[in-house]
Amino acid sequence: MKGLLAGTIAAATFAVASAGEYCGQWDWAKSTQYTVYNNLWNKNAAASGSQCTGVDKISGSTIGWHTSYTWTGGAATEVKSYSNAALIFSPKQIKNIKTIPTKMKYSYSHSSGTFVADVSYDLFTSSTATGKNEYEIMIWLAAYGGAGPISSTGKAIATVTIGSNSFKLYKGPNGSTTVFSFVATKTITNFTADLQKFLTYLVNSQGLPSSQYLITLEAGTEPFVGTNAKMTVSSYSAAVN
């Protein structure tokens, strides 16, 4: 595919990707604006399974991609992977961000049986442009099969409306990182938003320092368990202004 590089994190050289899929734990494909990761970071939590990801199209700032997997056995409450499209951008302090426009349209299919997964944006911030993750902000568009976010209490700390969508907000620790998770009250498969509004809410209402740098912006799916599952993102775009 023209304009796309493929490889692994450890690879020393890259090759132009074909329209095929990549299935290695840390495989990825890269365009000028996005890196699409397979990212099977917790595959050993499953008794068996595999996952493959592929980029379908690139048109300007919009990308289309998909990921297919089967994860069975093991802990049904543990995420196995996070196949995602990560925006390539320079870190920027929240107080200096004007807008974070994004669009994401997707569909999800799976075989009968237990299926647990979420579809989510994942943002990380740090006190410096090159620092470690201090805050994680997740925006869940879907929580399939009872998937639940990190939470100290198991209960939402607030219900907020951002744009035209309602979300329940959860808070909890992941090691030394404070995690805020906005979980949509109903599944959203065609999402258009300014993600800066989520950050502004957290700054104004939940104590997120506006001096934090946004260092990562990703969107994808976290599967817990599922057979012959496939998420197809027909169009995705994001920018940090």
Curated annotation (Swiss-Prot):
<protein>
    <recommendedName>
        <fullName>Xyloglucan-specific endo-beta-1,4-glucanase 1</fullName>
        <ecNumber>3.2.1.151</ecNumber>
    </recommendedName>
</protein>
<keyword id="KW-0378">Hydrolase</keyword>
<comment type="subunit">
    <text>Interacts with host apoplastic glucanase inhibitor GIP2.</text>
</comment>
<keyword id="KW-0119">Carbohydrate metabolism</keyword>
<feature type="glycosylation site" description="N-linked (GlcNAc...) asparagine">
    <location>
        <position position="190"/>
    </location>
</feature>
<feature type="active site">
    <location>
        <position position="136"/>
    </location>
</feature>
<dbReference type="GO" id="GO:0008810">
    <property type="term" value="F:cellulase activity"/>
</dbReference>
<comment type="function">
    <text>Glycoside hydrolase that exhibits xyloglucanase activity. Acts as an important virulence factor during P.parasitica infection of its host Nicotiana benthamiana. Also acts as a pathogen-associated molecular pattern (PAMP) in host species, where it can trigger defense responses including cell death. The PAMP activity is independent of its xyloglucanase activity. With paralog XLP1, is required to elevate apoplastic sugar during P.parasitica infection.</text>
</comment>
<keyword id="KW-0624">Polysaccharide degradation</keyword>
<dbReference type="Pfam" id="PF01670">
    <property type="entry name" value="Glyco_hydro_12"/>
</dbReference>
<feature type="signal peptide">
    <location>
        <begin position="1"/>
        <end position="19"/>
    </location>
</feature>
<dbReference type="InterPro" id="IPR002594">
    <property type="entry name" value="GH12"/>
</dbReference>
<keyword id="KW-0732">Signal</keyword>
<dbReference type="GO" id="GO:0033946">
    <property type="term" value="F:xyloglucan-specific endo-beta-1,4-glucanase activity"/>
</dbReference>
<feature type="active site">
    <location>
        <position position="222"/>
    </location>
</feature>
<keyword id="KW-0843">Virulence</keyword>
<dbReference type="InterPro" id="IPR013319">
    <property type="entry name" value="GH11/12"/>
</dbReference>
<keyword id="KW-0325">Glycoprotein</keyword>
<dbReference type="InterPro" id="IPR013320">
    <property type="entry name" value="ConA-like_dom_sf"/>
</dbReference>
<feature type="glycosylation site" description="N-linked (GlcNAc...) asparagine">
    <location>
        <position position="174"/>
    </location>
</feature>
<dbReference type="GO" id="GO:0000272">
    <property type="term" value="P:polysaccharide catabolic process"/>
</dbReference>
<comment type="similarity">
    <text>Belongs to the glycosyl hydrolase 12 (cellulase H) family.</text>
</comment>
<keyword id="KW-0326">Glycosidase</keyword>
